[in-house]
Amino acid sequence: MNVAGEFTTATPIAGLRALGAKPDVLERVSTLRDVRTGAGGVVHAVFTPSISLGQIPLATTITTLEEDETGARLRVVGRRGTQLVDVDLRMDFKSTTDGLTVVNWNAGLIVRGNAASVGQRVARDITMRAIASVLAEAAQVAGSAVSDAHL
């Protein structure tokens, strides 16, 4: 399944690119907790998206596959028991003339386990909202961290 979205943020591209190396900043995202960086720069966290079914915490790993000034490609894997969400996430960054950053993202994802069969009718909407929400909030906290660093 594929989902995509776009948002605009005041956070500069450099601030977005630095997120993977700053678990203390990612920890400020409301749906992430226990954020740490492991071997090879892999980010480990518990991701708990708010969905209509309640909160479902997923033990999550985020691996940067590619990254440069124009964007990044990440592999995000979330697990809970026998449930698995495997996401290939591509983000493209573009600076605007008024100093903002436009983030276009698209994600190919696979859902495995009971959640795949039970939630297949709603999986697209749930995952699109969860990804859009965590990306936009991560960009916002990255912007706050950049502002705090300049104070």
Question: What is each stretch, according to the model?
Answer:
Residues 22-23, 126-135:
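Short, well-ordered alpha-helical segments
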Residues 33, 58-66, 87-95:
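Hydrophobic/aromatic beta-strand elements that line small-molecule binding cavities or substrate pockets
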Residues 1-44, 50:
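Hydrophobic ligand-binding cavity/cleft-lining segments
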Residues 37-80:
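Glycine-rich portal/gate segments that line the openings of hydrophobic small-molecule binding cavities
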Residues 135-151:
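Short, highly charged C-terminal tails/helix-capping segments
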Residues 77-128:
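Beta-strand/loop substructures that line and gate deep hydrophobic ligand-binding cavities in soluble
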Residues 13, 37-40, 65-71, 92-102:
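A short, structured loop/turn motif at beta-sheet edges
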Residues 1-6, 42, 71, 86-88, ...:
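Intrinsic-disorder/low-complexity, polar/charged segments enriched in Ser/Thr/Lys/Arg/Asp/Glu/Gln
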